[in-house]
């Protein structure tokens, strides 16, 4: 995408801020349905960043696959499993503190692993360098063309050099879907238990007394 330098910087900062705020909302909001909608906004913002990087195919794949398929699947799972508004009921969690600590450490480890991979990955192919003199302008243009690549080159790199991060992201999306179903299912079971207790506490119409739960 060809834009003025100032517009590019502003758009990049805006999209990065949208990704950060949306990601925090996905994690912190108590309503899982709102979190799913914010997840769609995060994925759309990432697609916008791809457009700024002239990765049109990757941006289109991001919208079609992640927003149009995976995020919609998560929304369907939430709305079909959970009959209420998706709010996590307080005090219904049976997870122990040890389990929560393990989950937190696992998330921190995955985040550190991805950050280390981003920092240490050689994003430029070997032998391709940025030209810094007028005599190297032709080589720089050829390198730029080579870096744009084609669909076949993208597929080759995804399933060779970047296979591990690709599978890690797929695993994270699977965990997100399973977690959404578990949270929604847990609240539904809690509501059923409350309904059963309410039925047991209904007064007996014959004598007007409340039956005992013993």
From Swiss-Prot:
UniProt similarity note: Belongs to the complex I subunit 6 family.
Membrane disposition: Multi-pass membrane protein
Catalysis performed (reactions): a plastoquinone + NADH + (n+1) H(+)(in) = a plastoquinol + NAD(+) + n H(+)(out); a plastoquinone + NADPH + (n+1) H(+)(in) = a plastoquinol + NADP(+) + n H(+)(out)
Location(s) in or outside the cell: Plastid, Chloroplast thylakoid membrane
Keyword Transport on entry: yes
Gene Ontology cellular-component annotations: chloroplast thylakoid membrane
Function comment: NDH shuttles electrons from NAD(P)H:plastoquinone, via FMN and iron-sulfur (Fe-S) centers, to quinones in the photosynthetic chain and possibly in a chloroplast respiratory chain. The immediate electron acceptor for the enzyme in this species is believed to be plastoquinone. Couples the redox reaction to proton translocation, and thus conserves the redox energy in a proton gradient.
Subunit structure: NDH is composed of at least 16 different subunits, 5 of which are encoded in the nucleus.
Transmembrane region(s): 10-30, 32-52, 61-81, 102-122, 163-183
Pfam families: Oxidored_q3
Main subcellular localisation: plastid
Enzyme class: translocase
Keywords, sorted A to Z: Chloroplast, Membrane, NAD, NADP, Plastid, Plastoquinone, Quinone, Thylakoid, Translocase, Transmembrane, Transmembrane helix, Transport
A GO molecular-function descriptor: NADH dehydrogenase (ubiquinone) activity
The EC number(s) this enzyme carries: 7.1.1.-
Protein name according to UniProt: NAD(P)H-quinone oxidoreductase subunit 6, chloroplastic
